[in-house]
From Swiss-Prot:
This is Fibronectin. GO terms for molecular function: heparin binding. InterPro entries: Fibronectin_type1, FN_type2_dom, FN_type2_sf, Kringle-like. Fibronectins bind cell surfaces and various compounds including collagen, fibrin, heparin, DNA, and actin. Fibronectins are involved in cell adhesion, cell motility, opsonization, wound healing, and maintenance of cell shape. May be involved in osteoblast compaction. CDD domains: FN1 (cd00061), FN2 (cd00062). It comes from Notophthalmus viridescens. Dimers or multimers of alternatively spliced variants, connected by 2 disulfide bonds near the carboxyl ends. Residues 55-98, 103-145, 146-190 form the Fibronectin type-I domain. Residues 1-50 form the Fibronectin type-II domain. Forms covalent cross-links mediated by a transglutaminase, such as F13A or TGM2, between a glutamine and the epsilon-amino group of a lysine residue, forming homopolymers and heteropolymers (e.g. fibrinogen-fibronectin, collagen-fibronectin heteropolymers). The lineage of its organism: Eukaryota, Metazoa, Chordata, Craniata, Vertebrata.
Amino acid sequence: NSNGASCHFPFLYNNRNYTDCTSEGRRDSMKWCGTTLNLYADQKFGFCPMAAHEEICTTNEGVMYRVGVQVDKQHDQGHMMRCTCVGNGRGEWNCVAYSQLRDQCIVDGITYDVNHTFTKRHEEGHMMNCTCYGQGRGWWKCDAIDQCQDSETRQFYQIGDSWEKHVQGVRYQCYSIGRGIGEWHCQPLQ
């Protein structure tokens, strides 16, 4: 690439002198030119301006589309996008994630519609109730679920869970009650 340098005419390509832009050697018909006299020696080329009706965009699979055409493409991270061929002299695509078009949220690779609720484990281990708000940006919010955390082990327990605990050699059965304040109680086992 020539970093925006102007065309140099004539330029030599395939043992032939070109005095105008060509699409020779390109499957996508994009017109190009050499930006030095000898393309082989210098490996410098650039794309030529095209009329809007000539311009195309090419997918990774080699499929060609005219300016204005919309296609659905999969992003490298797996989510789907709606892409429009805008061209701009470079075969440029403008893509928008489905989550923005459909006002959805993508969380941990799972797509949720607006107002859908779901649970998610926080990186510290506690569970959260989450809601997809979308708002054109895939926005979502989570609040901690009423649960308990053992003050010694830092382990989280959901309401109704029970676990055994040893304190100074005595075995206890503990119960998660919650009540909005993380309440839990333990009783000695006989």
